[in-house]
From Swiss-Prot:
Organism: Desulfitobacterium hafniense (strain DSM 10664 / DCB-2)
One Pfam family from the record: GATase
Protein name: Imidazole glycerol phosphate synthase subunit HisH
Keyword line: Amino-acid biosynthesis, Cytoplasm, Glutamine amidotransferase, Histidine biosynthesis, Hydrolase, Lyase
Biological process, per Gene Ontology: L-histidine biosynthetic process
Gene, per the UniProt record: hisH
Length: 211
């Protein structure tokens, strides 16, 4: 079972529907107490960085999410859910993120239409399990006004460009993030979600053999 975190800042049902369509059971989690029952989680999100972190704190999600990330189970952030994985966001002032990945979330430079909305290509920087079966320069759907700035090359799996190059798929170990919306990016976005579902199932199988 894949859990989708409900903190009032995401299009939860479209992600849930996409996973079920692919054959991967999913449920929306309304309380941190439900985390232990799922084998992988997705943190969606739309809106502002500060509002998202405030909502996560208000609903008691921050420490449980950090603990879950450290458990080694698959963790995927989507759009704003990817951005809050990082250390600091600069939207409406400077705000602390979850700190699971190194980097800052900054605004696109002046001169570009904001938000960056629509289809854009993903240039694959390195192989990773989420990109298996997806061609280089495949199109994905984006909606965002801020982007991640990180000097840690090891976490950059895919890049896009909107006046400046920006990370579109990031991660290391079990914590990953997609700046685009895979649930709106058929067919390749659904392939990425399928790859995540396979990873969750494989990880759960390995864990059960260890126990």
């Amino acid at each position: 079972m894949i859990g989708i975190i409900d903190y009032g800042r995401g299009n939860l049902r479209s992600v849930e529907k996409a996973l079920w369509k692919l054959g991967y059971p999913a449920k929306v989690l309304e309380s941190p107490a439900e985390l232990m029952a799922v084998k992988g989680i997705i943190l969606p999100g739309v809106g502002a960085f500060a509002d998202a972190m405030a909502a996560l704190e208000e609903k008691g999600w921050i420490q449980p999410l950090i603990h879950y990330a450290h458990s080694g189970k698959p963790f995927l952030g989507i759009c704003l859910g990817m951005q809050v994985l990082f250390e600091v966001g600069e939207e409406h002032g400077e705000h602390k993120g979850l700190g699971l990945l190194p980097g800052r979330v900054v605004r696109f430079p002046a001169g570009r239409k904001i938000p960056h909305m629509g289809w854009n290509t993903l240039h694959q920087e390195k192989p990773c399990r989420l990109l298996e079966g997806i061609p280089d320069e495949a199109y994905f759907y984006f909606v965002h006004s801020y982007y991640v700035a990180s000097e840690e090359q090891e976490i950059l799996a895919g890049m896009s460009d909107y006046g400046v190059p920006f990370p579109a798929l990031v991660g290391r170990d079990n914590v990953w993030g997609a700046q685009f919306h895979p649930e709106k990016s058929s067919p390749w976005g659904l392939k990425l979600l399928e790859n995540f579902g396979k990873w969750v199932n494989e990880d759960a199988t390995v864990s059960s053999h260890r126990s």
